[in-house]
Curated annotation (Swiss-Prot):
This is Pleckstrin homology domain-containing family O member 1. PANTHER family: PH DOMAIN-CONTAINING PROTEIN, PLECKSTRIN HOMOLOGY DOMAIN-CONTAINING FAMILY O MEMBER 1. The gene is PLEKHO1. The record marks 310-311, 345-346 as: Cleavage. Gene3D superfamilies: Pleckstrin-homology domain (PH domain)/Phosphotyrosine-binding domain (PTB).
Length: 409
């Protein structure tokens, strides 16, 4: 026997709601539980009217006599209920009415079976529309009384009297002199509100006077701090002149003449054209006097150069011997290997080729060093011959060089 769901019944509705026609009525099968062998489905007459859902065992005209009444505001949505791998036509017509997951909601989930898939879609659309209207009706019924309005944020606030007088200049100067211990002084140039008519000083003059006072106070505080912090460790340090002890008044700055560069410094930054013009301007008797003077002996190191050449020659000879030995060893291995033109695959052959390459590079480097040393020796001998030339030939060559340079210019 079917029990009445008295817990879900609501109070009497208003007159307009009772007189309104139902949105949808019809017979559907409702899920009533599981039996021993199969599920239990029973035919029920369902009436959707407003935000109420009426379910009865037989068709009735008066909703007051219906056994089960459900408020759609307690439900979240209505959707299709279908098993993924089921081929039965019955599973294509199932739909469920899911309750909302709010605390205190005791409304049950309802499962129905429509006559056809088209009827199922019609019931789903109608129930979802009714659920939306029920939720909106709950929001529309929220009323706000006139007495509970929020107060205006700026219109009703208390007004504050702004009649406080700004601080005077003397107070600001006193605060600045006592609060600035690191030498920084803040100047706040706020003019007093009630200046006396007997002192018609302008803003610029008052600013200049305040600035002079501030600079004087700053200089005095710095002198006191420096005298307390600096203690000379010796008589020499105490005898040195101090910049902070010099009088401020009467001190004038005298620009000094730029330092004259010596001939060596000028030659460092002179251009090639200036150097050539200076050499051309040298008189002939100066060159003759320089030529008559005995040549200054230039310290040569022939023994050191010879030792370097011998060392390079020995290293070159040793490197060539090692290279010849490695090449012979590599040729012997290549002849014994079959086929002769196969690429080297063992680590020993790769190491042999790498050694041969390195020895070849070393041999070429030693040969280059030997050539460089030979050029150095030749340049040294040529320089000696130039120093031992006669003064007349030296003067003649200098004149020829100067004429050649002039012709190029």
């Amino acid at each position: 026997m079917m029990k009445k769901n008295n817990s879900t019944k609501r109070g009497p509705q208003d007159g307009n709601h009772q007189c309104a026609p139902p949105e949808k009525v019809g017979w559907v099968r409702k899920f009533c539980g599981k039996g021993i062998f199969r599920e239990i489905w029973k035919n029920r007459y369902v009436v959707l009217k407003g935000d109420q859902l009426y379910i009865s065992e037989k068709e009735v005209k008066d909703e007051k006599n219906i056994q089960e009444v459900f408020d759609l505001s307690d439900y979240e949505k209505c959707e299709e209920l279908r098993k993924s791998k089921s081929r039965s036509k019955k599973n294509h017509s199932k739909f469920t009415l899911a309750h909302s997951k709010q605390p205190g909601n005791t409304a049950p989930n309802l499962i129905f079976l429509a006559v056809s898939p088209e009827e199922k879609e019609s019931w789903i659309n109608a129930l979802n529309s009714a659920i939306t209207r029920a939720k909106n009706r709950v929001l529309d019924e929220v009323t706000v009384e006139e007495d509970s309005y929020l107060a205006h944020p700026t219109r009703d606030r208390a007004k504050i009297q702004h009649s406080r007088r700004p601080p005077t200049r003397g107070h600001l100067m006193a605060v600045a002199s006592t609060s600035t211990s690191d030498g920084m002084l803040t100047l706040d140039l706020i003019q007093e509100e009630d200046p006396s008519p007997e002192e018609p000083t302008s803003c610029a003059e008052s600013f200049r006077v305040d600035l002079d006072k501030s600079v004087a106070q700053l200089a005095g505080s710095r002198r006191r701090a420096d005298s307390d912090r600096i203690q000379p460790s010796s008589d020499r340090a105490s005898g040195l002149p101090r910049l902070w002890e010099k009088p401020d008044k009467g001190a004038t700055y005298t620009p000094q003449a730029p330092k004259k560069l010596t001939a060596t410094e000028k030659s460092r930054c002179a251009s090639l054209e200036e150097i050539l013009s200076q050499r051309d301007a040298v008189p002939a008797h100066t060159l003759q006097r320089r030529a008559e003077d005995p040549p200054t002996p230039i310290p040569h190191a022939p023994g050191q150069l010879s030792r370097i050449q011998d060392l390079v020659a020995r290293k070159l000879e040793k490197t060539q011997e090692l290279l010849a030995e490695v090449q012979g060893l590599g040729d012997g291995k290549r002849k014994a290997k079959e086929p002769p033109r196969s690429p080297p695959d063992s680590e020993s052959e790769q190491l042999l080729l790498e050694t041969e390459r390195l020895l070849g590079e070393a041999s070429s480097n030693w040969s280059q060093a030997k050539r460089v040393l030979q050029e150095v020796r030749e340049l040294r001998d040529l320089y000696r011959q130039m120093d031992l030339q006669t003064p007349d030939s030296h003067l003649r060559q200098t004149t020829q060089h100067s004429q050649y340079r002039k012709s190029l210019m």
